[in-house]
Amino acid sequence: MEDIKTTWQKIIADTLNGIAPETCDKILPEQINIETPPNPEMGDVAFPLFTFAKSFKSSPAKIASDVCARLLENEDIKKYGMPKAIGPYLNVFLAKGDLASNVLDKVLKEKENYGKTSSLSGKRIMIEFSSPNTNKPLHLGHLRNDALGESISRILKFCGADVFKVNIINDRGVHICKSMIAYQKFGEGKTPESENIKSDRFVGDMYVAFHKYSQENPEKAEAEAKQMLLDWEAGENKELIGLWKKMNGWAIEGIKETYKRTGISFDKLYFESETYLKGKDQILKGLEAGVFYKEEDGSVWVDLAPIKLDKKVLLRSDGTSLYMTQDIGTAISRHKDWPFNQMIYVVGNEQEYHFKVLFYVLKQLGFEWADDLYHLSYGMVNLPEGKMKSREGTVVDADDLINSLQDEALKKIEENGREKEVGDAAVAAENIAVGALHYFLLQVSPKKDMLFNPKESLSFTGNTGPYLQYMGARISSILRKAETAEGKEKLKDGKLNASLLTNESEWELLKTLEDFPEQVERSALRKDPSALTAYLYELSKAFSRFYRDCPILSGEDADLSYTRMELARATKIVLQNAMNLVLIPFMEVM
């Protein structure tokens, strides 16, 4: 069944074509933008007509008035709703019965597919996120990165895109060598198993130990780390390479456990140790072609004046590469591995300069697909105590944060005496913790810095993940009651009749359900899940008002009770679909 808003797009496009000047191109339904009026008194849906002013050589208000007048001449239009011109907008008061029937039928039929669109069908989108170092566990900053990358991947896929998720593991460099030196000096042959410590935490403890060592012996410690890196790059010290592989293995094993815990996955892992030499040949080709230039000391540079920046070194005077060089090579390799229409890098805003230069250099090298590269920049995430630091060992580890949230959630379950109802209380508490974490991280627009408040995130009331989970469990409980002998008795003669849904709370809930596909599109277009988190909160509030105002099983009218139960069922479907897109575990019981 066609969406009622899509029907109105077609109606308005046809009407515009009927009154357009002969010089105008044919107007297509998808050219008609859709908005929601600021208050219900102005209608249920608004269609701005600004974009047609130039081709019509008329004001948007005049166009809206003419379209409205033409529509009101057609009595058949009224079955879809009543149009009204309000300034440059054509607003529509939708026919409640038809909308209710349309929405319920569509949601109940499409189920987990409700809200999916084909707007990105045929698009191949690669997205890079997380990018951990193998000298320490994931921290709170990674959690924001991971949540953004995974959520946006799911949203883009929901809109029809073929999405390929990649992760570059930073497994080489001086910082990796520092953990290795500490293990050689202080590890005493210990392992994560022997110390009963999560493997990435064990490696991170070595990094902290090196920092303490370097404070006591600064010049010696740094010299040792640099020498170890040279020895590693030479590749001849088998014992050193063995230690590197062992410690990287520990770190990656632990990091993967955290990914599993938070619902994060990838289609391909890249390793810096395999990519760091890439790109040098491309820089030399660019030098030969005159795209880059060489200084007297032999270093190779690019002039960034065309993008209003200074200049950037691409190869050092000794011929060694930089991060920029390897990122150039890695980007080229990825496009060969999996030709994409767009490549999204989810990386903090401190790297904005880096990506401006990277995209420009690739374009200068003749790669047209450089226009399809996008840096999804996001802000710093802090705790109330202040910024995170890693080398001193005062960083907020991802696992520690989740564990503390889980402990608090478990306390609440026990305080409310819900251990028996939720089944495995520890699993339920972890689901609440992950939901609280992801909702809090994703409700803020990526570009903004944010303060993560663990206590606020766990609240079961207000704009939080646990509140959404509670609402899902509440609806599930209502639906279970319908399956009891008493519920079946009350509903046995009932039939679905959407025209009975005339209460204002029912109407608002239906309109909110109908709005879900539009919110998915908005989040995909902006690459910003915060529109969906805001939508989830509005949906939960709309259901709460409906449940308060409209008795489901206590009514005398069997058809009305049955229809309201189906409205609750539809709400659960949309809630589940939306929560999945923003990584919040749905809970049948809380």
Swiss-Prot record:
UniProtKB keywords: Aminoacyl-tRNA synthetase, ATP-binding, Cytoplasm, Ligase, Nucleotide-binding, Protein biosynthesis
Highest taxon of the lineage: Bacteria
One BP term from GO: arginyl-tRNA aminoacylation
Pfam family, one: tRNA-synt_1d
Keyword Protein biosynthesis included in the entry's annotation: yes
Motif 'HIGH' region in this chain: 132-142
EC id: 6.1.1.19
Subunit structure: Monomer.
Record-given protein name: Arginine--tRNA ligase
Source organism of the structure: Treponema denticola (strain ATCC 35405 / DSM 14222 / CIP 103919 / JCM 8153 / KCTC 15104)
Gene: argS
